[in-house]
Amino acid sequence: SSRVYMKSAILERDEKQFDAALRLIEAGLKSYPKSPKLYMMGGQICSDSLPKEKANLERARKFYQRGLQQCPNNAVLWTLASRLEERASTFDSARSADAASGATKARSLLELARLKNPKSPELWLEAIRLERRNGNQKLAESLMAKALQENPSSGALLAESILTAPR
């Protein structure tokens, strides 16, 4: 099962054998292309464990893009892909740290995710937090209002709304 590939890749990753882990993930994806965790692991290994180089950023992007094509309803996959885009500027030392560009790409990715999964409170919450991390308080409040209209019974959104409400 895909779980065997995943656990084997985790073992290789823990042993710092990143190439072996990625080979196992690719082999697992050939047999189980609808397994979102394998795409997540591939993207995370490329973005977090390998050196912060442009080639590894592209490898991580490809894992997430392939995963989103196969599993478009997986909120965690969308979230990881948007976070990768948000911090993409840390991968390119030749370019000045352009966080605004990363936030723009992350924002558009989350917008697409919410169009495909409008009833996913996790995606709304990630979009709200992205705006807060980038200092767009008004936009975050506007998104929160829309999110609560779309998902009125979401405990996570209600909790976030209460925690971030002005006192």
Where in the sequence are the language-model features?
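Alpha-helical solenoid scaffolds in eukaryotic macromolecular assemblies
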Residues: 1-167
